[in-house]
């Protein structure tokens, strides 16, 4: 998690962010969330991205810009200590509705990256873990959108986390995106 190996958490967890972003979203009690994004420049990565992050040598630290956007929370019980504003009732949008949501949010993320002159974009599996989004839906949305941005960046990479015992998210993303 980027928040564990950088100063991102401290940039996102400020009174201004709570006032403008988190508090209004929690008050909505909507596990689908909305299309808002947060662009955070100049994040310093100073720990390794391992199970137990370790401080890197100072010469190995690097700076990245981060774009934050919430994925739909499709958990059976969406509210927990980390998502206390997501309500207590599960939502069940259709795969088509979810694909539209994912495409819109991904376009916002990539538009922000273009506006801020990013040359490399690293995207995740956007909700396919803890938020229970279907990898096929998210990967298909990503493929549809990324086609329109292929020449806007030097690199578009997907970092898809998998548990050692289950690489299904990776296999789905690899299958869907391999034709790009």
What residue spans do the PLM features occupy?
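Macrodomain-like recognition of ADP-ribose-binding/processing modules
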Residues: 1-180
């Amino acid at each position: 998690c980027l928040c564990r190996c950088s100063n991102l958490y401290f940039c996102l967890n400020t009174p201004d962010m709570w006032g403008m972003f988190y508090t209004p979203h929690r008050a909505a009690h909507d596990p689908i969330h909305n299309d808002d994004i947060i662009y955070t420049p100049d994040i310093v990565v100073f720990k390794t991205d391992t199970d137990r992050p370790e401080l890197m040598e100072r010469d190995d630290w690097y700076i990245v810009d981060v774009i934050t956007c919430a994925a739909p929370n499709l958990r059976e019980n969406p509210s927990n200590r980390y998502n206390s504003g997501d309500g207590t009732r599960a939502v069940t949008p259709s795969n088509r509705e979810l694909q539209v949501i994912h495409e819109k949010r991904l376009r916002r993320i990539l538009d922000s990256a273009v506006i801020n002159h990013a040359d490399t974009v690293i995207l995740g599996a956007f909700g396919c873990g803890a938020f229970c989004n279907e990898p096929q839906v998210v990967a298909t949305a990503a493929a549809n959108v990324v086609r329109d941005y292929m020449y806007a960046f030097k690199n578009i990479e997907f970092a898809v986390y998998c548990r050692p015992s289950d690489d299904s998210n990776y296999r789905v993303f690899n299958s869907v995106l391999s034709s790009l």
